[in-house]
Amino acid sequence: MCYHRGMSASPATVARAPRGGDLFGHPRGLTFLFATEMWERFSYYGMRALLVLYMVKYLLDPQRAGQVVGLGAFRSALEFVFGPLDVQPLASQIYGFYTGLVYLTPILGGFLADRVLGQRRTVILGASLMAAGHFMMAFEHLFLFALGVLILGNGAFKPNISTQVGSLYALDDRRRDSAFSIFYVGINLGAFLAPLVCGTLGEELGWHYGFAAAGVGMTIGLIIYLFAAPTLPRDAFARREATHAPLDRTGWQSIVALLLLFLPVSLFWGIYEQQGNTIVLWASEHTDRHALGFEIPVTWFQALNPFMIFAFTPFIVALWRRQRAREPSTVAKMAIGCFLAALAYLLLVTAAVVSGGTHASWLWLFVYFVVLTVGELYLSPTSLSLVTKVAPLHLLSMMMGVWLATSFIGGFLAGYLGTFWSSMTKPGFFLMLAIISALAGLAITLLIRPLRVVLQD
């Protein structure tokens, strides 16, 4: 049986968290999921902050690259498709493959939870794999194997922790959007701390210290989740009961609606993921990082986006509450997010032109992150909430995995676009990114009216 927005569901068919009292207006389970996700994102973004710099400045040096098991064959495969790759384009492609594949495997993770293990055990499996993968990153010859373990672990973890947040609330509970925004703060609190801790350790003490710190963070998240069980939804059996339920017309319409939004959202993530790719290189090679007599470490710029999400979320949520009947629909918010991302890259076009080939002020990057962050807040948490509201109940984890696969396409696109960094002018490169994001926003805008009835948005 499928349940959609505006319809209530009975306790027999929808898993609900045990009654343990609300905390600040939300179920206690949200607090534990918040903390677990915070530490998981600490580990992910700690490694992400270092990844491109580590490859460009250290690992892909010809004297070291030969020691990495499997790298020669992997590079040959990439060059067969894309042609010869120097160090920077190769690093961008590896970054793109990693950031893409960590969001493809959630489809399998959602299926595993829905049909085999249940969400709790799948989350535990994923967290354990990721902890192991981060510690493996400390050994450079295991680099590709470590990335593979991290990819598999993320696939098991990511869709199911997000789905459990939605399962804490009835489908018509107006707290759902704010719950995902709060959950998103947890994501970005961990992502903010990660570059400051892992990035500093990696840049100042050695790359492997930064990767080991990421492993410690994931281990802490796993421990928190193991203690959280009494507060979380008991949904594994409910999923099995609904496994063979046929889809009705409304269910198919909801799935088609989500798939129509898939491509433009994927384009957004391809532009967004330049933060950990070419934006790192812009900060390292083309930015004057001196402020008050102090040179800002390159990895610290990766802390700006999550810090701003942490700071801006309460104001965005308050704005939506004040608008009430005038609040943009979920799909309209997603379009606004894409247009703001385009504006962010137009700012970098201006910075590249004004600097005239010299080092641009770090303030340009700061303003870029402000605009991009607001755009992300309009798109990402609202789209996650949309999936949990309209996806058929018995396919919820799988559809969450499919939706997270927008970042799979985006990750590959980010890697491919990054290969043009060395060959294009910097104003031309950033203008290309702005145009792609604006086209994504236009495509979503054209879908607002057709999808309004289907999504009841």
Regions found by a protein language model. Give the residues of each.
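Hydrophobic core of transmembrane alpha-helices in multi-pass small-molecule transporters
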Residues: 38, 133, 141-157, 357-378
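Glycine-rich segments within core transmembrane alpha-helices of 12-TM secondary carriers
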Residues: 102, 175-203, 210-221, 225, ...
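Central cavity-lining transmembrane alpha-helices of secondary-active solute carriers
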Residues: 92-111, 303-316
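Intracellular loop-helix junctions on the cytosolic face of multi-pass helical membrane proteins
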Residues: 1-32, 171-172, 198-297, 316, ...
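A membrane-interface helix-boundary motif in multi-pass transporters
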Residues: 87, 200-216, 327-332, 360, ...
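Transmembrane alpha-helices of Major Facilitator/SLC transporters
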Residues: 227, 294-324, 337-345
